[in-house]
Amino acid sequence: MARFAADRGAAREAKDPMAAVCVLATVDEGGLPQARTLVLRDIPEGLALYVNASSPKWEQTQKQVAVHVWWPSIQVQYRIQARCEALPAEHIAESWQLRPDVPKQMDWLYEQRPQSSVVSSRDDLLNLL
């Protein structure tokens, strides 16, 4: 992890926009691979990906996952295999206070409907908000 942190620091110094994100790869209930780009957060214990518990990806993270990062500014990539675990509720509550208003509104929406659920139209989404 020390080398990862040093390389990520170098990518941040180079203002690499990819230093803030990673690709999380999982396998869905049908055995199909799923990959999505997420913000990669630093926490004292290591790294964190914030995943809404109502999202299908939360269930998928309960097994083995793969994380891929690519920092073009320093020509370095990492492929990491890991297991995920939930962060303490206190940590999540503190972090949530730092979020911008729009993501907070989206969190409220996810309490009404599961994340990644189909929305029939933009108007329907705006009506929910």
Residue ranges of model-derived segments:
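Binding-site signature for planar aromatic cofactors or substrates
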Residues: M1-L129
